[in-house]
Amino acid sequence: NYIEDAIKKGAKIIVSEKKLLKKRPNLVFLFSSNVRKLLAETSQKILYKKPKKLVAVTGTNGKSSITDFYYQILKLNSKKVASIGTIGLKYKDKNKTLDNTTSNPVYLSFILNELWKKKIEFVIMEASSHGLDQNRLDGLIFDVGIFTNLSHDHLDYHKNMKNYFNSK
């Protein structure tokens, strides 16, 4: 099992949604009812410096387009802006491919901290339903949230429209 493998590899702290049955010497065990949420919030606290304004765009369709339009409008108005999403990480003249529309919380915290170091003031990011449901954006405070639309999609993951809507 994963916990045993982690201990064998030298882990000193275990964070789990399951209670450990036996105590172990030199091992700290932390229980959390939502490990993903804890990871996201902790990541944001450790790498807490980020651009001044954060904007999230969610919805079934149009996230990438709206994110890119918003990015272009701010850039044309000489704002120090970045965008994060399906089309990657864009800022200044850089464009980096990302693995997911909404990155994992540790990597996202790192990206935001790096953008802050580069004096970026505005970040527009896509907030996918998977990313929201998996708590990847927890710990972030958005200045603006944009909801494009909701249609029958991603039901293989969310199972029904109510769950899909609630993730948004």
In which residue ranges do the predicted regions lie?
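Flexible active-site lid/hinge loop adjacent to a nucleotide/diphosphate
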Residues: 95-96, 100-168
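Short loop/helix-cap segments at secondary-structure boundaries that form the rim of catalytic
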Residues: 18-27, 90-92, 135-141
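Short, basic phosphate-binding NTP loop
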Residues: 1-58, 65-82
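Ser/Thr-centric signal marking residues that sit
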Residues: 58-60, 65-66, 86, 102, ...
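Short beta-strand-centered segment that lines the nucleotide-binding/catalytic pocket of NTP-utilizing
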Residues: 78-92, 128
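Short glycine/serine/threonine-rich phosphate/pyrophosphate-binding segments
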Residues: 63-69, 127, 131-132
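Glycine-rich nucleotide phosphate-binding loop and flanking beta-alpha elements
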Residues: 20-22, 63, 131, 153
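Short, charged, surface-exposed secondary-structure boundary motifs
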Residues: 24-26, 39-43, 92-94, 154-159
